[in-house]
């Protein structure tokens, strides 16, 4: 079992290296991209004067699911960590002197935000771009469904619904 797991880990690492070489660029990991994009889109949404503002703001909010999930999976306080992450990325976008904060991502081992460029925590740009694109396309597909899917109660062999069969006691042995 241990050898299989090691083989998968080495394979995964080689795939990451392959993606980095293909895309020739990396982005900081640990939710940094999602936090930065969320802040940017929230600011952009406030400049809109139409109903599109609501959709953009909600999409921006949805991007924070990634850093929140990272924190929750590591049993960390996701609210506090994501708030700090957002504060760093907001500062990086509004203050030109603090542009270096754009590299801040989550350090889940120590439960804090850190400079992931210095820590060497990166993701291939191609992987990040594709994952955001596919997730967005999946959400759009779901939103385009305009049919009501109705499930009818199951019926047993006597023509009764499951709830009726439970009430009548016909399911008991």
UniProtKB/Swiss-Prot annotation:
GO terms for molecular function: ATP binding; ATP-dependent protein folding chaperone. It is found in: Cytoplasm, Cytosol. It comes from the Eukaryota. InterPro entries: Chaperone_TCP-1, Cpn60/GroEL/TCP-1, GROEL-like_equatorial_sf, TCP-1-like_intermed_sf. Its main location: cytoplasm. Keywords: ATP-binding, Chaperone, Cytoplasm, Nucleotide-binding. It holds the Pfam family Cpn60_TCP1. Component of the chaperonin-containing T-complex (TRiC), a heterooligomeric complex of about 850 to 900 kDa that forms two stacked rings, 12 to 16 nm in diameter. Component of the chaperonin-containing T-complex (TRiC), a molecular chaperone complex that assists the folding of proteins upon ATP hydrolysis. Belongs to the TCP-1 chaperonin family. PANTHER family: CHAPERONIN. This is T-complex protein 1 subunit alpha. It comes from Ambystoma mexicanum (Axolotl).
